[in-house]
Amino acid sequence: MSQEEAESSIIYEEPIDIPLEDDDDEDELEEENSVPLSSQADQENAENESDDSVDNVVGSETPRSVTGLSVDPRDVADEEDEDEEGEDEDEDEDDNDVDNEDENDNDNANENENELGSSRDKRAPPAVQTSKRYKKYPKLDPAKAPPGKKVPLHLLEKRRLGRIKAAEEFAKTLKKIGIEKVETTTLPATGLFQPLMLINQKNYSSDYLKKDDQIFALRDRKFLRNNNTSQISSTNTPDVIDLKSLPHSEASAAPLNDEIDLNDPTATIVIHPGSNSIKIGFPKDDHPVVVPNCVAVPKKWLDLENSEHVENVCLQREQSEEFNNIKSEMEKNFRERMRYYKRKVPGNAHEQVVSFNENSKPEIISEKNDPSPIEWIFDDSKLYYGSDALRCVDEKFVIRKPFRGGSFNVKSPYYKSLAELISDVTKLLEHALNSETLNVKPTKFNQYKVVLVIPDIFKKSHVETFIRVLLTELQFQAVAIIQESLATCYGAGISTSTCVVNIGAAETRIACVDEGTVLEHSAITLDYGGDDITRLFALFLLQSDFPLQDWKIDSKHGWLLAERLKKNFTTFQDADVAVQLYNFMNRSPNQPTEKYEFKLFDEVMLAPLALFFPQIFKLIRTSSHKNSSLEFQLPESRDLFTNELNDWNSLSQFESKEGNLYCDLNDDLKILNRILDAHNIIDQLQDKPENYGNTLKENFAPLEKAIVQSIANASITADVTRMNSFYSNILIVGGSSKIPALDFILTDRINIWRPSLLSSASFPQFYKKLTKEIKDLEGHYVNAPDKTEDENKQILQAQIKEKIVEELEEQHQNIEHQNGNEHIFPVSIIPPPRDMNPALIIWKGASVLAQIKLVEELFITNSDWDVHGSRILQYKCIFTY
């Protein structure tokens, strides 16, 4: 590079002050400057006629680029410099060439001005001024710019303006097509489906969110499928290990790399925790392993000095007046039912039972003649779990139950801390998995996944704690959760809209399932179940002079006897209710086996009939256990931003707790107003759940009324046309539902207590028509100018009430004109599938989920839990968490 070229490069690095408003003149100047370069090239090429490549470039017109801009004169200068270097010209000749170019520029500029017409004459003065500027400052002339240097600023500015114009044209094209970006939308959300997200204008032409790898759940699933690296290693490059050098131990028998095959049902364990027992097993097993929900702890390990509930007390035959009144009402209902079905009731049946039981004496059975003796456990040196805990004597052990109603038993008085409860949960699960049937050692837990069944109205804090225990403490590969009612439909093979009634040991849960979703506002949890029936049945037996008068119902052997009697004798079959002779064997620790004979009459039906009179259960409970320490350590879940309770808030649960049931209203107008106001109550529950009802209040609503409440709210909040399907598909499951003829009496009770308005087959059409007319009134109402806002609202409400009364009278007239029972929704109770225990249907449904491909998207791995925490449940749940 010459010295002059170096100096010119220094000038181009400095900022240049060039006016940008004369773009047209500058374009013209570029064309003019290109002409002398071409003429100079003609002169040089005349001397070298053998160079054909240069001849092709020579012309009277400057070639154009793709963008329509003139070819940069510096490119032509580059070619000239190369030719000059090839001829080995010295620096003096280069200086002469530059001077010749200046002369040619002036000559060619004058020639071009003469050839152009009058239209170009108008633009001549600016061009002349520009050429004069280049003469005054020759180093600013683009034609003299050295090769490979910066582009002039006026060209950069022109390109920028071109890009702005292109963006405007692109925006016009998007608007014409209809895919432009809209910041706000005024269209309200309608229907059951959420509106689609607006297109991302930035990435609309790319593959953004169009591949499975760009979706979190699918990307994580693919990673787990193809995971050939150790999860412990944090690097992407696996370590090179010599397999021959590894020790042949049990721990190394597992695959070196923790591969997770999410679609392998043999590597999945299904767990359904219940109040009475835990159902656990592999998905392909015919039946799960049923482990009693019991942990026997030696009394010497516990501080029970200040506990008044330790000693077992006998049931008192004498009860309160309120108890006797409810019992009299139940007996009256029983006699009316027997009379309706033409069953004869002996007048002196109760006297016959009492006289026989008073004179009944026990028969001693020797140990060798006992068909099923019990080997009681007296060794209090360790803990016992499951069925072994049931054989521990009460004098040396305390029975703790870590689960209640599908969640942690925070009401148990025997737990001092949450750590004790979690310890019992982990040890009980390890005991169940280590049984002979499953034979899964704790060291192999990391090779299995878990499908966990949770209640319909679940507590988020309990679910999250349970998942954390399974992933971090027991170290399973992954965990997926499913609600009980949905699992019930899977297990029973029902795909239509269904009302599921699950009668458990401690709780009874009701929920409606529609299109694979548990409807939130239909879920109800009743705080009574099979254990309450057992206790009440034992009390009725004692009031009939049961031979075993010192019966300690709270002792372990006393409770086992009561459970056995309830299972064998309670029934709803009218034909089986008579004065009959029965017998049983009493097995107690340190006592010989005794055989008793006794008689029963209506006690076999009165005890389960309390499902429809549940207030009597509240009167026979010894005390409402409450462990404030555990409730403080495991509080209810709250929103991180608003600090409001964020558990599921069911409208049916709230109304049944407060006693606001449709079946208790005799006026159809009140029922209709309550139904129309349901959406407002739902909004209030979601905004301020603490202000509406006590969450700790127990729910003792009658079973048949709760079912009607659940179906009505499910139909109103989701689709009112589903009401007929819900009444036609009522599925009863649970261990305490195995009472003969329960479906028969439940159908009668629903037909008796269901309001006439809600039982009409024309109610869905009536409700849809009424709501449409109310919306029309609200939309077309014109406020009076001389009235205040409150007065206008009162006028509108008066018109709405008038319309409701008018439509209701028309509905009553239509019902009266119909004949027979064709206008009434039929009630149908679906029996469990043949040869299937109703207590195991929920577990079976969860095992079905574990074998379908959908479960791959629901599994939560340990890495997911570490990174996202409980937020991962919002993305990997089959329901709205």
From Swiss-Prot:
Q: Give the similarity note.
A: Belongs to the actin family.
Source taxon at top rank: Eukaryota
Localized where?
A: Nucleus; Cytoplasm, Cytoskeleton
Q: What does this protein do?
A: Probably involved in transcription regulation via its interaction with the INO80 complex, a chromatin remodeling complex. Exhibits low basal ATPase activity, and unable to polymerize. Strongly prefer nucleosomes and H3-H4 tetramers over H2A-H2B dimers, suggesting it may act as a nucleosome recognition module within the complex.
Specify whether Nucleus is a keyword of the entry: yes
Subcellular location, principal: nucleus
Mention one GO molecular function. Answer: ATP binding
List, as start-end ranges, the regions of compositional bias called Acidic residues: 14-33, 44-54, 77-114
Which sites bind ATP?
N502, I503, G504, A505
Q: Name one GO cellular component term.
A: cytoskeleton
Which keywords does this chain's UniProt record carry? ATP-binding, Cytoplasm, Cytoskeleton, Nucleotide-binding, Nucleus, Phosphoprotein, Transcription, Transcription regulation
Location of Phosphoserine modifications = S65, S70
Residue ranges the record marks as coiled coil: none
Q: Note the subunit structure.
A: Component of the chromatin-remodeling INO80 complex, at least composed of ARP4, ARP5, ARP8, RVB1, RVB2, TAF14, NHP10, IES1, IES3, IES4, IES6, ACT1, IES2, IES5 and INO80. Exists as monomers and dimers, but the dimer is most probably the biologically relevant form required for stable interactions with histones that exploits the twofold symmetry of the nucleosome core.
Asked if the record carries the keyword Transport, the reply is: no
Q: What is this protein called?
A: Actin-like protein ARP8
Give me the ranges of the annotated region Disordered: 1-150
Q: What else is known?
A: Present with 1010 molecules/cell in log phase SD medium.
| InterPro entries to which the protein is assigned, alphabetical | Actin, ATPase_NBD
CDD domains recorded for this chain?
ASKHA_NBD_Arp8-like (cd10206)
GO terms (BP aspect): chromatin remodeling; DNA damage response; DNA repair; double-strand break repair; mitotic recombination; regulation of DNA-templated transcription
Q: Which organism is it from?
A: Saccharomyces cerevisiae (strain ATCC 204508 / S288c) (Baker's yeast)
